[in-house]
């Protein structure tokens, strides 16, 4: 299992568009991928579960991946988040 702590820096946090980009990306992987904020955990392949985390700007999340492509999954998610979900702010 691989994990990575990341800070959400985009203005609107994990809103619908950002969550949709996460789901699109994570569905390319076979690994089980989760996002954790505080004591709440969401399946990163479910837009509704991601939105229920209510992740705002400045929040720290923990991404975990478990499976044969876990390293690639964590890497690609980290890059997406570092690019602020390709949003112009």
Walk through the language-model features, giving the residues of each.
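Alpha-helical protein-protein interaction elements
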Residues: 6-7, 21, 72, 77
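Compact, glycine-rich, soluble single-domain proteins
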Residues: 7-48, 52-57
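C-terminal structural segments of small proteins and small subunits
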Residues: 56-89
């Amino acid at each position: 299992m691989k994990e990575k702590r990341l800070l959400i820096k985009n203005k609107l946090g994990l809103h619908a568009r950002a969550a949709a980009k996460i789901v699109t990306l994570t569905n390319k992987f076979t690994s089980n991928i989760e996002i954790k904020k505080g004591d709440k955990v969401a399946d990163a392949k479910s837009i509704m579960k991601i939105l229920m985390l209510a992740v705002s700007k400045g929040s720290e999340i923990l991404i975990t991946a478990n499976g044969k492509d876990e390293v690639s999954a964590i890497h690609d998610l980290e890059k997406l988040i570092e690019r602020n979900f390709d949003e112009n702010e």
